[in-house]
Amino acid sequence: MAERSLMLVLHDVAPETWPDYRPFVEAVDALGQIPICWLVVPDFHRRNRLDDHVDFRRLLDGRLARGDELILHGFYHADEAPSPRTPRDWFMRRVFTHEGEFYPLSREESARRLQRGIELFQRHQWPLHGFVAPAWLLGPGARQALAATGLTYTSDPGHFYLLPDYRTVDAPGVVWSARSAWRRGMSRLVSERMLRRHQQSPVLRLGLHPVDMRHGFSRQYWLDLLTRLLADGRNTTVSDVIVSGQAHRKRY
């Protein structure tokens, strides 16, 4: 049987969200040496500037030393652009999410924010290979700007995309909508169905959000699922390992 990989991905990582994640991360660490992918927001909702939070940066330094990966995740993680003008844009920016920061941005503004994020990683000597847009939404301008950064990958809920040409790598992801009890119940059913469908997938990602950690039902599900997938023989890894391997195969 081919090797099957598993990635544990924490979205919306910021000083404000760390108290949500901390008990879960401690429980994961207690299971052994399990690498985690941290989607780091440089200034979450304009009130969490990483440059102002030395203790949190030291935490991230420590996670890198453990073998974790830090990934750039937007800049503000907030959609502050003018109101949408078309039905499609209204749906994407007001129904699907209110946090699709890079969906309405021009190429120029996208490039500016991407460069600021890259410079933050450089300033703190954090290796950087990937960018994941808030809510996985990249508008046309953002796609063009991201392709020119020199980063190696981005992703959406079902795929990695190798930059700069957005070549596709299948990587199904399990993600919850946990803001209400009925959504949490439905998310569990959908997740189990998806897991059965992708049981033999070479790559499987678990995409967690801070809101998942605020409810015992969803938090325990993620911990139990991680334990179950490890017992099923999946090997935990980080995004860059998978993407680097895929890029190598494409070249040779």
Language model feature labels by segment:
Residues 35-40, 153, 203, 208-252:
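C-terminal domain-boundary segment and adjacent tail
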Residues 103-176, 214, 219:
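Catalytic domains of cell-wall/extracellular-matrix polysaccharide-remodeling enzymes
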Residues 1-69:
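Active-site beta->alpha N-cap acidic-glycine motif
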Residues 69-88:
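Short, solvent-exposed beta-strand-terminating loops
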Residues 12-20, 42-55, 78, 82, ...:
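Acidic-and-aromatic substrate-binding clefts and catalytic sites of carbohydrate-active enzymes
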Residues 6-10, 36-38, 70-73, 128-131, ...:
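Hydrophobic faces of well-ordered beta-strands that scaffold small-molecule active sites
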Residues 84-105:
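Active-site gating loops and adjacent loop-to-helix segments of metal-dependent hydrolytic enzymes
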Residues 167-217:
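A conserved mid-domain beta-alpha-beta active-site/ligand-binding segment of alpha/beta enzyme cores
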